[in-house]
Amino acid sequence: DQISKSKSIGVYSINDSQMNGENQNQLHTHLSDLITKHDLVIVSDYGHGFISRETAKHISKLSIFTSLNAQINAANIGYHTLNNYQNIDCVIINETELRHELRDRESDHEELMKELSKNLQSKNLVVTQGSGGATLFNSESEKYHYCPAFAGKIVDKVGAGDAMLALISCSLKSGFSPDLGLFMGSLAAAQSVETIGNSIPVNKIQLIKTFSHAVK
């Protein structure tokens, strides 16, 4: 909407067919070669055919810090699942995706987080709740960590989860505490929702200024 500068509707056309076996094997080989040159792997699985069950299993076995966002959307609901992954260091989903994964819309979300974390053998599970902020469950300490939502103006939510995924992944990989990692990710997500799509990247200087102001 050019007047309100907010997103009204999105229309997508996607080829979500699976890759053939030869291309999939090439992808696995390429991934195995790449991890020797990098510090962490960030996976965004949108459920449109690029990452098959076999590729998800291959990713799960990579000997490197790995983070995952496997989202449910209108095109893949009922077909997409997190269960193809195991031993992921950091998983980020929203509360709707959490409840869909466990087929439970009534139970307390913290209990569901603990259950899903156990099923996936994930070290850190982050669940975003829109205006309710975000919760992180660490399976090693069995503690929950909380952070409020910081967004002042919401224009478009697309990309917020990706921004949070990137910042939390880098923070946890660098040895930050779960509280600090969740805080940094939430600040990045708040920046992201203030613009249409990914038209403007998360600004490092603004992020540092906001962080400095918040901790004073």
PLM region descriptions:
Residues 85-91, 132-161, 208-215:
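Flexible glycine/proline-rich, aromatic-decorated loop/lid segments
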Residues 40-43, 47, 56:
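Long hydrophobic segments that form regular secondary structure
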Residues 53-144:
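Conserved phosphate/ATP/ADP-binding segment of small-molecule kinases
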Residues 123-124, 150-213:
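Conserved post-catalytic alpha-helical subdomain immediately downstream of the catalytic base
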Residues 1-42, 62, 203-216:
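Conserved N-terminal subdomain of the carbohydrate kinase-like
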Residues 14-17, 97-99, 152-153:
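A short, flexible beta-alpha/helix-coil linker loop
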Residues 45-46, 70-72, 92-96, 102, ...:
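Active-site proximal loops enriched in glycine and acidic residues that flank catalytic Cys/His/Asp
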Residues 17-22, 33-37, 103-111, 139-144, ...:
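Short, glycine- and charge-enriched coil/turn segments that flank and shape catalytic ligand pockets
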